[in-house]
Amino acid sequence: RWDVDQCIYYCLNGVVGYSYTECQTMCT
């Protein structure tokens, strides 16, 4: 299973313009 914290980390660093909340929503 994809680790949520790791997903958020990669989302924040890899997806331009995404906020923490948006990454959290996408990753959970």
Swiss-Prot record:
Family recorded in the similarity comment: Belongs to the conotoxin L superfamily.
One cellular component term from this protein's GO annotations in UniProt: extracellular region
Tissue: Expressed by the venom duct.
Domain notes: The cysteine framework is XIV (C-C-C-C).
Swiss-Prot/TrEMBL keywords: Disulfide bond, Neurotoxin, Secreted, Toxin
Protein name: Conotoxin as14b
Function comment: In vivo, intracranial injection elicits scratching and grooming activity in mice, and causes body and rear limb extension and tail curling immediately upon injection.
Disulfide cysteine pairs (residue numbers): 7-27, 11-23
